[in-house]
């Protein structure tokens, strides 16, 4: 006989006895058998396929490159916004047309007089961007400005 450490018996489900068939019926069904609780069969989980080992996530451009790209985008957006606004308002006087052109150029940008070709400054901006950026699509704004300059001087 197994000894228990606790004084009280472990809790279990109450056991009911089946009612006894009456003696009058000779075709009574046999008493139901208690169902044995068989554990359900669970097949082992299939191992997950091993892919390439997870490496360190690739880092994007540095903080300074992101700031430069953002500043370039802001400058391009400002230039395009002024150009579109000038088209809608008709440009006004010649004084009003010169102000957006001066505002669109960065403060340290060299003037066109230092270059031999009319759109050389815009071309160099595009080339510098393409050489410094890993994604050339970030330089599409410089390319568009260069194309606008070529169309203006063609």
UniProtKB/Swiss-Prot annotation:
InterPro entries to which the protein is assigned, alphabetical: CHCH, CHCHD2/10-like
Protein's UniProt keywords contain Zinc-finger: no
Short name of one Pfam family: CHCH
Disulfide bonds: 119-149, 129-139
Keyword Glycoprotein annotated: no
Domain CHCH positions: 116-154
PROSITE patterns (UniProt xref): CHCH (PS51808)
Motif mapping: Cx9C motif 2: 139-149
UniProt GO cellular component terms: cytoplasm; mitochondrion; nucleus; striated muscle dense body
Keyword field: Disulfide bond
Comp. bias (Low complexity): 7-28, 48-57, 96-109
Motif Cx9C motif 1, residue range(s) on this chain: 119-129
Stated name of the protein: Hemiasterlin resistant protein 1
Organism: Caenorhabditis elegans
Lineage: Eukaryota, Metazoa, Ecdysozoa, Nematoda, Chromadorea
Gene behind the chain: har-1
């Amino acid at each position: 006989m197994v000894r228990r450490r606790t004084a009280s018996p472990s809790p279990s489900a109450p056991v009911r006895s089946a009612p006894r068939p009456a003696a009058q019926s000779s075709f009574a069904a046999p008493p139901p058998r208690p169902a044995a609780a068989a554990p359900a069969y669970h097949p082992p989980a299939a191992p997950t396929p091993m892919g390439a080992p997870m490496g360190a996530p690739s880092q994007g451009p540095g903080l300074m490159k992101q700031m430069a790209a953002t500043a370039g985008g802001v400058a391009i957006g400002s230039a395009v916004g002024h150009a579109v606004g000038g088209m809608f308002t008709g440009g006004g006087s010649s004084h009003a047309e010169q102000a957006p052109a001066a505002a669109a150029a960065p403060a340290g940008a060299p003037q066109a007089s230092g270059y031999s070709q009319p759109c050389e400054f815009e071309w160099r901006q595009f080339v510098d961007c393409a050489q410094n950026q890993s994604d050339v699509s970030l330089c599409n704004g410089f390319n568009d400005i260069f194309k606008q300059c070529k169309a203006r001087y063609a």
